[in-house]
């Protein structure tokens, strides 16, 4: 299969994920959450099983669309249920652990899936995912509360959440941070191998290191969110912007280049739990009918930031070399700083 076709499959998955998540989340917000989660997990299992069986590219595309259509809503629902059943004082760290779970899945899942595909076939990778899905399904069926408090509302009543200034600032911050991250992360492989001259054999280990840094970032995110996180966001984003600005110079040396990349992979994650809590707390207090939508906002607008950052990166390398990516990404860092100061003012009133 040509690389361009693989790229199309990835783009199609991301596009369907971004579009379907708010639609399905909003349309199903009045359903029983336990039954909805079981239904979505069933569809997820079917999508991955069809992927494992795919004999043609068209079949594969159809199967990935099925999976993408429900993946975002499943994540949103998990975050929602976690926020409901977790005591308020433990909520930041538990949400951070949920985020760390996704990072761990990426860090371990991607190289493991690649290894299985190399030793056996990519079909076998998806058969294993289907098997794991059945195990997770059984655990969720056992542990998930059958009934949780929920306030029902029409689609327009749910969308009223998007009028709130704190929510809009949180959305802007999410887009800005992910845009900065993917301005450099889109080309992280050539940054490591071409600019810093690491060998191809070192690449996977260094990518694993960056993944571990993301997991550490999730844990720090929980600590920051537990200690008045909104007030600390400007400091986090100032550090993030400084690291982005020095990246170009740091890439001239292997050690400093990897240290700055590793630090960036930690810092760009720290905002997440705090912003998730902003969305949830605003919904709980002012828009209880929008709670399901609130828990999906980060995953929705993260995709917007990823797309914007990737576009920025590809445009930059058409006119400049890879070492300029950090300087360009810092523009998004400045935007995040400004938005975080505005958000902090709302919480100081």
Positions of PLM-derived features:
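Paired small-residue
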Residues: 47-50, 58-67, 255-263
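Extracytoplasmic gate region of multi-pass secondary transporters
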Residues: 168-208
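Helix-loop-helix hairpin linking two adjacent transmembrane segments in secondary transporters
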Residues: 59, 87-144, 187-194
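Helix-breaking motifs and short loop linkers at transmembrane-helix boundaries and internal kinks
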Residues: 32, 53-59, 70, 197, ...
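A late C-terminal transmembrane helix in Major Facilitator Superfamily
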Residues: 282-320
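Conserved MFS/SLC helix-loop-helix module at the cytosolic interface between two early adjacent transmembrane helices
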Residues: 19-55
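Helix-to-loop junctions at the C-terminal end of transmembrane segments
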Residues: 21-32, 218-229, 317
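Cytoplasmic helix-loop-helix junction between adjacent transmembrane helices
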Residues: 57, 63-102
């Amino acid at each position: 299969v040509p690389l361009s076709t693989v790229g199309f499959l990835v783009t199609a998955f991301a596009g369907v994920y971004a579009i379907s998540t708010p639609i399905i989340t909003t349309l199903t917000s009045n359903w029983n959450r336990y039954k909805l989660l079981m239904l979505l997990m069933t569809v997820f299992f079917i999508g991955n099983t069809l992927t494992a069986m795919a004999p043609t590219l068209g079949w594969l595309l159809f199967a990935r669309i099925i999976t993408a259509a429900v993946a975002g809503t499943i994540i949103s629902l998990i975050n929602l249920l976690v926020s409901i059943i977790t005591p308020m004082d433990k909520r930041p760290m538990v949400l951070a652990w949920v985020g760390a779970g996704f990072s761990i899945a990426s860090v371990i899942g991607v190289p493991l899936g690649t290894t299985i595909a190399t030793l056996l076939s990519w079909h076998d990778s998806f058969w294993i995912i289907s098997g794991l899905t059945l195990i997770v399904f059984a655990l969720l069926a056992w542990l998930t509360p059958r009934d949780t408090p929920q306030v029902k509302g029409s689609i327009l009543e749910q969308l009223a959440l998007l009028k709130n200034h704190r929510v809009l600032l949180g959305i802007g911050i999410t887009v800005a941070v992910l845009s900065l991250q993917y301005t450099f992360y889109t080309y992280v492989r050539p940054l490591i191998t071409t600019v810093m001259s690491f060998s191809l054999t070192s690449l996977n280990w260094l990518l694993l290191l960056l993944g571990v840094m993301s997991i550490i970032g999730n844990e720090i995110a929980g600590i920051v969110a537990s200690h008045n996180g909104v007030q600390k966001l400007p400091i986090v984003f100032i550090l993030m912007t400084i690291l982005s600005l020095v990246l170009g110079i740091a890439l001239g040396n292997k050690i400093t280049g990897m240290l700055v990349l590793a630090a960036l992979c930690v810092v760009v994650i720290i905002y997440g739990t705090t912003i998730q809590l902003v969305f949830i707390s605003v919904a709980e207090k002012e828009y209880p009918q929008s709670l399901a939508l609130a828990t999906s906002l980060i995953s929705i607008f993260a995709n917007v930031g990823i797309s914007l950052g990737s576009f920025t990166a590809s445009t930059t390398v058409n006119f400049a070399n890879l070492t300029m990516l950090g300087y360009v990404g810092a523009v998004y860092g400045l935007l995040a700083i400004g938005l975080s100061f505005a958000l902090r003012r709302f919480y100081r009133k």
